[in-house]
Amino acid sequence: MKMLLLLLCLGLTLVCVHAEEASSTGRNFNVEKINGEWHTIILASDKREKIEDNGNFRLFLEQIHVLENSLVLKFHTVRDEECSELSMVADKTEKAGEYSVTYDGFNTFTIPKTDYDNFLMAHLINEKDGETFQLMGLYGREPDLSSDIKERFAQLCEEHGILRENIIDLSNANRCLQARE
């Protein structure tokens, strides 16, 4: 009987933990909970050169500020070993949970998975000059995340057609942590 009770408790715990995850396109998504400080952990793209050193999309997220119909995103970039700050405003689109921002083309993005307290996974599609590419980012409240979360992110990338060799772990890269206020 004790073993059955223990298994029931374990099962309920797993259900509760799973229920805490949300997607920006789902009904249970609370955008207010993504407000605050974040760190870029991993970037992935079907055009790897966009996220390699000096790539235009090698951006290091510092903060998300939630407004009524938009998000203010504060990033840092590294060019020639120098950190620069970059802020942009992403506006809600007509699609549930989708935002758009103009940066090196027109971008739309969603947040397919987040638990609000530890990680956020974003999926972006860029359109420029008739060409498109996709980018995915794993962001954490702390400067690094567990290997389990990183593996879940890699699997999500594969589900979107991004190969593992196009996934770059930036947890040991210069992410301009010293430039944070």
Swiss-Prot record:
The keyword Chloroplast does not apply. It is found in: Secreted. Keywords: Behavior, Disulfide bond, Pheromone-binding, Secreted, Signal, Transport. One of its GO terms (molecular function) is pheromone binding. Disulfide bonds join C83-C176. Residues 1-19 form the signal peptide. InterPro entries: Calycin, Lipocalin, Lipocalin_CS, Lipocln_cytosolic_FA-bd_dom, Maj_urinary. Pfam families: Lipocalin. GO terms for biological process: aerobic respiration; cellular response to lipid; cellular response to testosterone stimulus; energy reserve metabolic process; glucose homeostasis; heat generation; locomotor rhythm; mitochondrion organization. The keyword Disulfide bond applies. It comes from the Eukaryota. Its main location: secreted. PROSITE patterns: LIPOCALIN. GO terms for cellular component: cytosol; extracellular space; nucleus. Major urinary proteins (Mups) bind pheromones, and thus stabilize them to allow slow release into the air from urine marks. May protect pheromones from oxidation. May also act as pheromones themselves. In this context, they play a role in the regulation of social behaviors, such as aggression, mating, pup-suckling, territory establishment and dominance. Binds the pheromone analog 2-sec-butyl-4,5-dihydrothiazole (SBT) in vitro. Belongs to the calycin superfamily. Lipocalin family. This is Major urinary protein 11.
